[in-house]
C-alpha cells in the first residue's frame, strides 16, 4: 500500500482522555534532504518531527510551534518547526563527531528542550526544560507536566518502511479541565506502549487503533495531511539583504560576483548579481518591497 503522511485525532468516550496518532515517511525524508547526518541524528530528527506534529495538533488556534534541542555537545542544535496546518521543516547543526549509537545526552551534552509557540495573534510563548530523561519523549512529558500540568504520554518509533526512513508516534493526554482517573490513564498508556514501529509504519491508523483499544469506545476524527513545507522565498532573502550596509553588499559582490543565499532547511539557493542588488536598493529607496 502507498504510505500517506497523516495525523489522526481520537477521543476515548468513556474517559477524559484524547489521543493523536501520526505516521510520517515522505515528510521525514524531505527534512533529512541532502544532509549527510549521522544515524543517531537522523533518528533524533525523526523523533522531533513526530513530536512537533503531535504538539501542533493540540493547538486550538492558528499558530506555529518550534521544538528544538540545544546544548554544548557535538549536536549544537536540532530543530523542527511546524504549524497548525501540519506544514513541517527542520534541520540539525553538528560540531563534532557523533557515534552511530549515541544517546540523547551524548549528542546534546548539557542542554535544554525549548518549545516556542508563536500564535498568529497574541504574544509568543516559550517554555524551557532541562533534559531530565534518557529519551526525547521523557523530556516532552516533563515539559507538559511543568507548563500545562496535564498528564501526557508520548510513544515515538523510528525506523524504515519499504526501504525508506519512517517515523511515527502517539500522544495521550488528559483533557483540560477534566479529571481522568489515574488508573484509567495508566491503563490506556500501558496499552499504547505495546505498539510496534512496524505496525505504525505499515498499517492504516484505524487498524492500529483497533489493535490497541478494541475493548474501549474510541471516536476517530478525519485525518489531516502532514507535509514538508519551507517558508523561504526570494523576497525574504531580498528583504534580509536590504538590512545590510551598502559597503558590506559591495564587498560581497566584489568577492564572489554575486550574493548566494542558501536555505539550510530545504537546500534552495537564491542568487543576486550586481544588477539585482542595484534594483533592490533602488526599490528600497522608493519604499517598495520586492516580490518573490
From Swiss-Prot:
Redox regulated molecular chaperone. Protects both thermally unfolding and oxidatively damaged proteins from irreversible aggregation. Plays an important role in the bacterial defense system toward oxidative stress. Belongs to the HSP33 family. One of its GO terms (biological process) is protein refolding. PANTHER family: 33 KDA CHAPERONIN. NCBIfam families: PRK00114.1. GO terms for cellular component: cytoplasm. This is 33 kDa chaperonin. The keyword tRNA processing does not apply. Signal peptide: none annotated. It is found in: Cytoplasm. Keywords: Chaperone, Cytoplasm, Disulfide bond, Redox-active center, Zinc. GO terms for molecular function: protein folding chaperone; unfolded protein binding. Disulfide bonds join 230-232, 263-266. Under oxidizing conditions two disulfide bonds are formed involving the reactive cysteines. Under reducing conditions zinc is bound to the reactive cysteines and the protein is inactive. CDD domains: Hsp33. The keyword Disulfide bond applies.
Amino acid at each position: 500500500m502507498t504510505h500517506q503522511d497523516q495525523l489522526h485525532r481520537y477521543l476515548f468516550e468513556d474517559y477524559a482522555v484524547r489521543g493523536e496518532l501520526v505516521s510520517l515517511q515522505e515528510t521525514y525524508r524531505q527534512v533529512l534532504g541532502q544532509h549527510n547526518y549521522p544515524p543517531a541524528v537522523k533518528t533524533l530528527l525523526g523523533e522531533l518531527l513526530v513530536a512537533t506534529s503531535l504538539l501542533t495538533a493540540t493547538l486550538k488556534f492558528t499558530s506555529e510551534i518550534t521544538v528544538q534541542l540545544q546544548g554544548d555537545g557535538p549536536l549544537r542544535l536540532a530543530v523542527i518547526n511546524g504549524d497548525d496546518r501540519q506544514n513541517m521543516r527542520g534541520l540539525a547543526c553538528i560540531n563534532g563527531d557523533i557515534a552511530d549509537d549515541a544517546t540523547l545526552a551524548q549528542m546534546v551534552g548539557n542542554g535544554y528542550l525549548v518549545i516556542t509557540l508563536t500564535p498568529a495573534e497574541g504574544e509568543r510563548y516559550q517554555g524551557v526544560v532541562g533534559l531530565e530523561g534518557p529519551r526525547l519523549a521523557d523530556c516532552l512529558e516533563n515539559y507538559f507536566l511543568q507548563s500545562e500540568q496535564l498528564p501526557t504520554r508520548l510513544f515515538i518509533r523510528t525506523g524504515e518502511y519499504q526501504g525508506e526512513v519512517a517515523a511515527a508516534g502517539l500522544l495521550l493526554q488528559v483533557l483540560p479541565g477534566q479529571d481522568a482517573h489515574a488508573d484509567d490513564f495508566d491503563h490506556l498508556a500501558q496499552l499504547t506502549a505495546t505498539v510496534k514501529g512496524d505496525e505504525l509504519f505499515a498499517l492504516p491508523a484505524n487498524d492500529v487503533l483497533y489493535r490497541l483499544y478494541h475493548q474501549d469506545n474510541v471516536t476517530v476524527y478525519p485525518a489531516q495531511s502532514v507535509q514538508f513545507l519551507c517558508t523561504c522565498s526570494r523576497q525574504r532573502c531580498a528583504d534580509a539583504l536590504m538590512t545590510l550596509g551598502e559597503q558590506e553588499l559591495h564587498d560581497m559582490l566584489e568577492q564572489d560576483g554575486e550574493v548566494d543565499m542558501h536555505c539550510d532547511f530545504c537546500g534552495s539557493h537564491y542568487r543576486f548579481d550586481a544588477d539585482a542588488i542595484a534594483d533592490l536598493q533602488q526599490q528600497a529607496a522608493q519604499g517598495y518591497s520586492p516580490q518573490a
